[in-house]
């Protein structure tokens, strides 16, 4: 089996590539290294079964050649992180929507099974918790850049589902909820690596807003395992599937737990959203997934707790000091 992973040099993508190699696949990685790195792939690159092509998925001819060579496609290439979305909205929209359209066209041309990684952000301001795949989505106004990412990902979902309806292209859409683990960068606003690095360096642990917003964090190994199973599951075709962990914690309690596990003396400092992201920033108070569909389709159940995640991230970040 030869598998194409767009965005395969990124945090989630590289973990998926490692799993695919372990199960015997040959892997093509298509990544422009805008957020991914060579380092994420170096420990598994034997020069034969994994090949990295440094190019943007918006390059239609290169992408088409990669899709044609592969037997199936995981599409992870995307702008990521709140900070990048706020700072570079044009890049966010063009890379997400244009890239997905390019990959889907080639998948349809060669009839390659396609898995899209979407995001829990598409639930927007929805208040029904836990979020189920068939729930309504509630977006904020277009004047607030924060919603450009969610809206672009929602358009990706519509496009993938349109290919399923019109051409029966085998597609699966996954909505990922706060995936975390070693090698994740804090550069683009990822909360756990940011907290851990601040704590280990004795810097203030900066919590945005009042800290009472809550999230659920899933280990990247659990998430990558679910992706690998879903693309190979016929019953998942044409469906949207939540992937994450349904154990909820407030961001303030997360900061306290990081401080405790690192043995840090850092203070916890509240930073207004406006100071962090500019005037008029919107956020979701709670984001909790229903995992019933994933469990039904592939027996998905997160196996690693938040403390497991934090322990792994802390151990990794200590090696970087």
Protein language model regions, located:
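Hydrophobic alpha-helix immediately C-terminal to the catalytic Tyr-X-X-X-Lys motif of short-chain
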Residues: 155, 159, 163, 195, ...
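Short, solvent-exposed loop/turn segments at secondary-structure boundaries
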Residues: 87-88, 183-187, 280-283
